[in-house]
Amino acid sequence: MGIAHTEWESVIGLEVHVELNTESKLFSPARNHFGDEPNTNISPVCTGMPGSLPVLNKDAVRKAVLFGCAVEGDVALFSRFDRKSYFYPDSPRNFQITQYEHPIVRGGCIRAVVEGEEKTFELAQTHLEDDAGMLKHFGDFAGVDYNRAGVPLIEIVSKPCMFSAEDAVAYANALVSILGYIGISDCNMEEGSIRFDVNISVRPRGSRELRNKVEIKNMNSFTFMAQALEAEKRRQIEEYLSYPNEDPKKVVPAATYRWDPEKKKTVLMRLKERAEDYMYFVEPDLPVLQITETYIDEVRQTLPELPHSKYMRYITDFDIAEDLAMILVGDRHTAHFFETATMSCKNYRALSNWITVEFAGRCKARGKTLPFTGILPEWVAQLVNFIDRGVITGKIAKEIADRMVSSFGESPEDILRRHPSLLPMTDDHALRAIVKEVVAQNTASVADYKNGKAKALGFLVGQIMKRTEGKAPPKRVNELLLAAMRDM
């Protein structure tokens, strides 16, 4: 990046729109469901028909409160809705109902691990609002689908408290994980049920100023998010370095950009509107939203154990590697799978590795995730137990795992019963003969081992396992090999 670039840092904040998985929309009884025929899930409220009046969805309020509790935010006893006016084909009323001045949640935080370091990212606020419709382009014309118009959203606004693309991606991952655990959204990026807008400015390292921010709209993958932030950081720094004596506000004006993944650059969409351009005013058709402390406490009691707490428990109670613990808790279904497996297997480290590495890789190759394959947690526990008890070798265990993923309906015990050829070598006399032969043919390695070169033992074990096609019990191989070398 060059020496000059290293003297600058990013300042990043995220605005995340999350569609709530309610049965109906935020202010109308119309169905809230993705993928239906265009303009079939609408009502007069959705399309802004004269005389139609909004009625607030109680379940959407509960889900917003639940999120506020999950992030330890301050849930407001009194909040209010406002009209945000703008003119666009996907907004039939020409305004959005949002919470501009009095959001339902203020504050809160998201905890994440960034490159091995635990960080806490502060939230500014979370507010309820309704979604817009969707423009669909067909060659030389466009249509509008209002099925999405009125779908309940929470917009989660962070403080400008991230200073690298790695921070932003870790924050986004942790946020998605929390939303999944509390079950208020499916967070499907491809369907647009969670949308990330990132705000970034740069400043000289050590400065506390906040310069004009650029918003990059609708990041639909974490990879693109990281790439866009790095590219925009470079662009802004180069602009400031090119015009060192100009007013910074003129060098990098506040604007909205999009990410072009093919050109690997951010592309200007429009200059930023000011708040007054939206002509905010109090929504006249909705009363103040009042919530009691008792209601908030009742909602808080329904919170499950959250990812960060679970992560710390896995490291402490199960003594598993931090990177594997992070993978396990990232998805509540995977975490549940692991915890169920621990009831049958106490080798937690091996279990975590088999779930997050061996089985995860095999399932991904088939477009699946382990908890949704039909493979039972008890079967993975059984596989690890078989290895620990010497029933099978690690090599054979991987063959069994291949068969488990291929069939999605057989336990290790079932597979061994149907394929006895997978069982380990039990002929001790034959194994002794192989060990004796390997020792006789590799006298140099034997001498190296006796002279203190521990790697030589691994080489000799490898030769024996190769000749037995991985079926020799490793523990017995070591016993016989050491005995054979002592007798030389």
Swiss-Prot record:
A Pfam family annotated for this UniProt entry: GatB_Yqey
BP GO terms, sorted: glutaminyl-tRNAGln biosynthesis via transamidation; translation
Keywords: ATP-binding, Ligase, Nucleotide-binding, Protein biosynthesis
Principal EC category: ligase
Enzyme Commission numbers on file: 6.3.5.-
Catalytic activities: L-glutamyl-tRNA(Gln) + L-glutamine + ATP + H2O = L-glutaminyl-tRNA(Gln) + L-glutamate + ADP + phosphate + H(+); L-aspartyl-tRNA(Asn) + L-glutamine + ATP + H2O = L-asparaginyl-tRNA(Asn) + L-glutamate + ADP + phosphate + 2 H(+)
MF annotations from Gene Ontology: asparaginyl-tRNA synthase (glutamine-hydrolyzing) activity; ATP binding; glutaminyl-tRNA synthase (glutamine-hydrolyzing) activity
Function, as annotated: Allows the formation of correctly charged Asn-tRNA(Asn) or Gln-tRNA(Gln) through the transamidation of misacylated Asp-tRNA(Asn) or Glu-tRNA(Gln) in organisms which lack either or both of asparaginyl-tRNA or glutaminyl-tRNA synthetases. The reaction takes place in the presence of glutamine and ATP through an activated phospho-Asp-tRNA(Asn) or phospho-Glu-tRNA(Gln).
Subunit architecture: Heterotrimer of A, B and C subunits.
Family named by the database record: Belongs to the GatB/GatE family. GatB subfamily.
Protein name, entry field: Aspartyl/glutamyl-tRNA(Asn/Gln) amidotransferase subunit B
Name of the gene this protein is made from: gatB
